[in-house]
Amino acid sequence: MSASDLTSVQAAAPQGSRQILVTSALPYANGQIHIGHLVEYIQTDIWVRTLRMHGHEVYYIGADDTHGTPIMLRAEKEGLTPKQLIDRVWTEHKRDFDSFGVSFDNFYTTDSEENRVLSENIYLALQEAGLIAEREIEQAYDPVKEMFLPDRFIKGECPKCHAKDQYGDSCEVCGSTYLPTELLNPYSVVSGATPVRKTSKHYFFRLSDPRCESFLREWVSGLAQPEATNKMREWLGDAGESKLADWDISRDAPYFGFEIPGAPGKYFYVWLDAPVGYYASFKNLCERNGIDFDAWIRPGSKAEQYHFIGKDILYFHTLFWPAMLEFSGHRTPTNVFAHGFLTVDGAKMSKSRGTFITAQSYIDTGLNPEWLRYYFAAKLNATMEDIDLNLDDFQARVNSDLVGKYVNIASRAAGFLIKRFDGRVQDSAMNHPLVAKLRDAIPQIAASYEAREYGRALRHTMELADEVNAYVDGAKPWDLAKDPANAVALHETCSVSLEAFRLLSLALKPVMPRVAVAVEAFFGIAPLAWADAAKPLSSAQPIKAYQHLMTRVDAKQIEALLAANRDSLQAEAAGAAAAGANAAKDAKSNAKASAKPAAVNGADDAPISIDDFAKIDLRIAKIVACQAVEGSDKLLQLTLDVGEEKTRNVFSGIKSAYQPEQLVGKLTVMVANLAPRKMKFGLSEGMVLAASATDEKAEPGLYILEPHSGAKPGMRVK
């Protein structure tokens, strides 16, 4: 660890006892938990366990997000009431979180009386503050179901490329975005009927109000992640600009949710009451355990409040949520921590490849949940970078790090200590230099966890495990045991090894809590906390017989996991086909013959040929210089090293997302064979690739592509 790294983790170390409220985003109650979800819950849980091990008062709160049109329609499709559906899904979600050791203090539901009261109170406070506006809007309406349709519940022909069965806001074939009114031959995915346009009164949170803008400009300065700060500033615009739009917080009946006070037939949009669900779940816990709820959520509270989320919902948690809290008389979040997305084997999760892996299928296949906790932790840091679950690397890393390095230490020493020394350690061995080194490292590892630098914490831990194994290899206890004259040396070697194993177990406890419980039972000690680094094993407490703590990952288990998830797709597709046939039959009298059943959720996009792809020359490029383009609000001028004799000049419309100095030295991907384009600012000799959401209005933001370390300028992407 470098001096700068050490300084940063020491700065993150806890100071005194703290009160801390932590949340993860609420899973939507219309589907299963999958491994993409688990990234966030495991990340949050590791952080929470780290804080608990310091002795802080920490509450980890969760709930199912249960309201909205999709819940209502799925329940109808399954012949259930919405309440029956969400109760069943809650049980499934709770089972999955328990399986993966996600230690919620309370896992609740947004469909609760606590949430209804809190949501109403927040709304009424915002109304009293003059931050609620009423407006007439025009929407698509299903004349058969007699309901207004969200954009994603309308399909039709893309107005740009004429692909069939595209959603009402974007085309999955050509990537175009458009208004639902621009769709050709539109139909309702609910009934198959042709939508009509109809006006309705809606309620808006006036996020554009100068008070909100002023507050958010100040609040953004406290965000821990530079990427989040940049996005916030992009959404806010420069001082004097008015880039914030008012937020539609209402939906029309029929709708599963909470009715708005004083507005019969109007309901809170799910994104209003969902974050309030954090407080509702906490209030439920407080009422059951005698905790002063108001002391935690009132302005000026000394308690801390943190939200772990995916970067795709940053907009809601860094704009709407803090503004709602500020102007309804509540404390605001201490910080929001966003993580990236999960890919599997370098690609988005795919049902057809079996990589859209559900939590339950992982458990049913017999894979150890702590393997996945460890692997995700090894990949996670404090940024919003995406992480990849490479299944070959998963097998290799778990087998090497956890079985080959960590567990191996105990298995090599415990038997000798039991047989030769009655299971009691040599007390003088607790002062061995190797033990002292591990003991001194524990605060650094704990601080890395608290700084959300889990990968760094585990690299440090495994480096120490390597040193312990080298010590055992050098001491050769199996040889020492052959001669009774070596009893003292053998006793010391085994004692040092097992105390080192205890300290490594302490370092790994936030990541692998169930292994830690087994280790605590093996040593006959109380649950490990960070302060226990200074409390070594004692000869007064003999160890128990060693039991195997972990097995290796078998490639056959991985194959079975992929096969199980491919099988689930086939079953789902068969069900969707049957449902589609029934829907077509029901819609025949209501809709045009062009109405189609919905496509299977998660199916892969239409493929292109290898010849099509080969026409594009994608190259790794290093940004050697970057500057803002005078006279342009959008462009940055990049000087790129593409492995050629000369650098290339490229203009890129990413100014809203990045400061020039952030990009210098980074690797990215460019289209190298794009025809040069003459612009008024100069010649652009290629195109830098960046990602953005399909609906950039709802989810603004740009993200340049960055290759893994090892890539070099000029390498071809293929």
Curated annotation (Swiss-Prot):
Protein's UniProt keywords contain Protein biosynthesis: yes
The biological process GO terms on file are:
methionyl-tRNA aminoacylation
Question: What does the entry list as the binding residues for Zn(2+)?
Answer: 158, 161, 171, 174
Needed co-factor(s): Zn(2+)
**Cross-referenced InterPro entries:** aa-tRNA-synth_I_CS, Anticodon_Met, Met-tRNA-synth_bsu_C, Met-tRNA_ligase_1, Met-tRNA_synth, Methionyl/Leucyl_tRNA_Synth, MetRS_core, MetRS_Zn
Give an example GO cellular component term for this record: cytosol
In terms of superkingdom, the source organism counts as Bacteria
- Which is one Pfam family of this protein? tRNA_bind
- Annotated ATP binding lies at 351
Q: How is the cofactor bound?
A: Binds 1 zinc ion per subunit.
Query: From the record, which residues define motif 'KMSKS' region?
Result: 348-352
Query: Any idea which GO molecular function terms this record carries?
Result: ATP binding; metal ion binding; methionine-tRNA ligase activity; tRNA binding
Transmembrane regions listed in the UniProt entry: none
| Keywords attached to this entry | Aminoacyl-tRNA synthetase, ATP-binding, Cytoplasm, Ligase, Metal-binding, Nucleotide-binding, Protein biosynthesis, RNA-binding, tRNA-binding, Zinc
Q: What class of enzyme is it?
A: ligase
Q: What is its EC number?
A: 6.1.1.10
Specify the tRNA-binding domain's residue ranges: 612-718
Q: Which PANTHER family match?
A: METHIONINE--TRNA LIGASE, METHIONINE--TRNA LIGASE, CYTOPLASMIC
State its role. Answer: Is required not only for elongation of protein synthesis but also for the initiation of all mRNA translation through initiator tRNA(fMet) aminoacylation.
UniProt protein name = Methionine--tRNA ligase
Organism (species): Burkholderia cenocepacia (strain HI2424)
Q: What is the lineage of its organism?
A: Bacteria, Pseudomonadati, Pseudomonadota, Betaproteobacteria, Burkholderiales
Please name the gene that encodes this protein: metG
